[in-house]
């Protein structure tokens, strides 16, 4: 799978040259590394792109506003829908992800946002138990 080969190349670069030791220490409990076999074994890979600008009929460039926010919200809704349908998901964001433009033949004005891995988890799948803050810790109510 060309996506796996390219993603693992970026991940190798990240783990060996880009990431600080502090970042690597934070990732250690999750057991992540440059090997991404799930990119081949998953039922589905969904490449999500955002489009920072478009062109009008005259070929003039037009800025698209709030693309990261819009795509982030839409992706969250998709993940929630998949989970409600019993499908496991994993967000994967190798950086940079421009290799997806080439492999998937997407135009340069589109920027990869996220690679969403979806499918039915294997028996060996490890889902980390990451503690979340309580709502009262992150919410302020104004009367």
Model regions and ranges:
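C-terminal helix-cap and adjacent tail motif
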Residues: 114-143
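Short hydrophobic/aromatic-enriched beta-strand-loop microsegments
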Residues: 13-15, 110-115
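Glycine-rich, charged/polar anion/phosphate-binding loops
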Residues: 29-34, 100-102, 125
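Glycine/small-residue-rich phosphate/adenosyl-binding loop
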Residues: 1-71
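Short, electropositive alpha-helical surface patch
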Residues: 99-113
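Small-aliphatic-rich amphipathic alpha-helix that forms the alpha element of a beta-alpha
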Residues: 46, 52-103
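Solvent-exposed alpha-helices and their adjacent loops that cap or buttress functional pockets
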Residues: 37-40, 105-108, 131-132
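Short gly/pro-enriched beta-turn/loop segments at secondary-structure junctions
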Residues: 39-42, 84-85, 111
């Amino acid at each position: 799978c060309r996506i796996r080969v390219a993603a693992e190349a970026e991940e190798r670069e990240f783990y060996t040259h880009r990431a600080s030791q502090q970042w690597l220490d934070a990732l250690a409990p999750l057991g992540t590394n440059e090997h991404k076999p799930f990119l081949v074994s998953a039922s589905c890979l969904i490449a999500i792109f955002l489009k920072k600008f478009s062109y009008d009929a005259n070929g003039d460039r037009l800025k698209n506003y709030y693309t990261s926010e819009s795509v982030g919200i839409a992706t969250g809704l998709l993940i929630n829908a998949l989970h409600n349908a019993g499908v496991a998901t994993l967000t994967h964001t190798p950086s940079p992800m421009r290799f997806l433009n080439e492999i998937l033949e997407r135009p340069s004005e589109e920027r990869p946002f996220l690679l969403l891995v979806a499918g039915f988890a294997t028996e060996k799948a490890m889902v980390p138990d990451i503690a979340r803050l309580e709502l009262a810790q992150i919410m302020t109510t104004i009367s």
